[in-house]
């Protein structure tokens, strides 16, 4: 059996920088969460076609791992035969609709595992470019940096050298639909975009930035949109917590 861990991420900050061709561009600090991850295992057996277990509630063709498999079929022509003798089993720990990148992380880790088992015929850059066709966050998980500045549509991933923070996460029993949160932002908040307000943030270490700004609304442009889209979030006592991605997870630095 072959296994790989697919780690969650948080967004230390997330700022929308524009809107092009129907998609929002951004600047964000992604930080890997080392103690929260899904585990993907390739289990030997005999199967008629690609088989995926452990992702309940998501139809196969909509699953990010399956999309990654499809994206890899051309550069890995023997992959279809390989998955007639192996199935994919996912042990899920990352909650969905939580702003932690679980589906994207699964796709990125799966791609890294397949590339590694094939003696890495694709460069990490090439693998990340393939990943960008699956989802905006996938390239970050392909590179698997502990911390990185992510720009554009998510395809520009620049490692940021810093000591990773020890984080405490709080994920309420509230799912935030990423597409709806972005739609709310676009409709009501895009006009408030001000790149000067976050000038130089990408050069600051995450701990300093969280201490200096200390305001989840200022740090994450999607937070107000998430509050509007998921009003149950407003009923939570989240003083001292920051907001990751489109939600619904909050995080803070451990004492």
Curated annotation (Swiss-Prot):
Highest taxon, organism lineage: Bacteria
Pathway: Isoprenoid biosynthesis; isopentenyl diphosphate biosynthesis via DXP pathway; isopentenyl diphosphate from 1-deoxy-D-xylulose 5-phosphate: step 3/6
An example Gene Ontology molecular-function term: 4-(cytidine 5'-diphospho)-2-C-methyl-D-erythritol kinase activity
InterPro entries assigned: GHMP_kinase_C_sf (IPR036554), GHMP_kinase_N_dom (IPR006204), IspE (IPR004424), Ribosomal_Su5_D2-typ_SF (IPR020568), Ribsml_uS5_D2-typ_fold_subgr (IPR014721)
A biological-process GO annotation: terpenoid biosynthetic process
Cell wall biogenesis/degradation as UniProt keyword: no
Keyword annotations: ATP-binding, Isoprene biosynthesis, Kinase, Nucleotide-binding, Transferase
Pfam families per record: GHMP_kinases_N (PF00288)
Active site (UniProt): 9, 137
ATP-binding listed as a keyword: yes
Binding sites annotated in the UniProt record for ATP: 95-105
Transmembrane segment boundaries: none
Documented EC number(s): 2.7.1.148
Signal peptide interval: none
Reactions the enzyme catalyzes: 4-CDP-2-C-methyl-D-erythritol + ATP = 4-CDP-2-C-methyl-D-erythritol 2-phosphate + ADP + H(+)
Family: Belongs to the GHMP kinase family. IspE subfamily.
Function statement: Catalyzes the phosphorylation of the position 2 hydroxy group of 4-diphosphocytidyl-2C-methyl-D-erythritol.
NCBIfam families per record: ispE, PRK04181.1
Protein name, as recorded: 4-diphosphocytidyl-2-C-methyl-D-erythritol kinase
Organism: Sulfurovum sp. (strain NBC37-1)
